[in-house]
Amino acid sequence: MKVILLEPLENLGDVGQVVDVKPGYARNYLLPRGLAVLATESNLKALEARIRAQAKRLAERKAEAERLKKILENLTLTIPVRAGETKIYGSVTAKDIAEALSRQHGVTIDPKRLALEKPIKELGEYVLTYKPHPEVPIQLKVSVVAQE
């Protein structure tokens, strides 16, 4: 029996693959759990349409990431914080950086995609990587300065 996988399964394949399985396995395990659908002509057409739509969305996201890269790589984000000699009071997190970028330059980013291993706790210049798309990493320059 041919089925279209809706979830990646270790022994069968990835999402969207058409695989041939035993009828009992399909009827008793894959279909009731929503892991696969029968490979009918209408389901195959729906799968093709979904694949085309997903490819279009990925291309749009990549184009948006390229546009964002042109904007972000040419600027340095300055974040003023309360500080002593070199240490700051508190820390600067990815969320703080995203808010400052939105406030100062009107650019909105997802803080979860900003590679910041631990919060910034000292004054200085930092180069962070932002990944809005897996193929488009962006180097963002951040300057943490003492508030006057």
Curated annotation (Swiss-Prot):
Coiled coil: none annotated. GO terms for biological process: translation. One of its GO terms (cellular component) is ribosome. It comes from the Bacteria. GO terms for molecular function: rRNA binding; structural constituent of ribosome. Pfam families: Ribosomal_L9_C, Ribosomal_L9_N. Keywords: Ribonucleoprotein, Ribosomal protein, RNA-binding, rRNA-binding. The keyword RNA-binding applies. Binds to the 23S rRNA. Belongs to the bacterial ribosomal protein bL9 family. PANTHER family: 50S RIBOSOMAL PROTEIN L9. This is Large ribosomal subunit protein bL9. It comes from Thermus thermophilus. The lineage of its organism: Bacteria, Thermotogati, Deinococcota, Deinococci, Thermales.
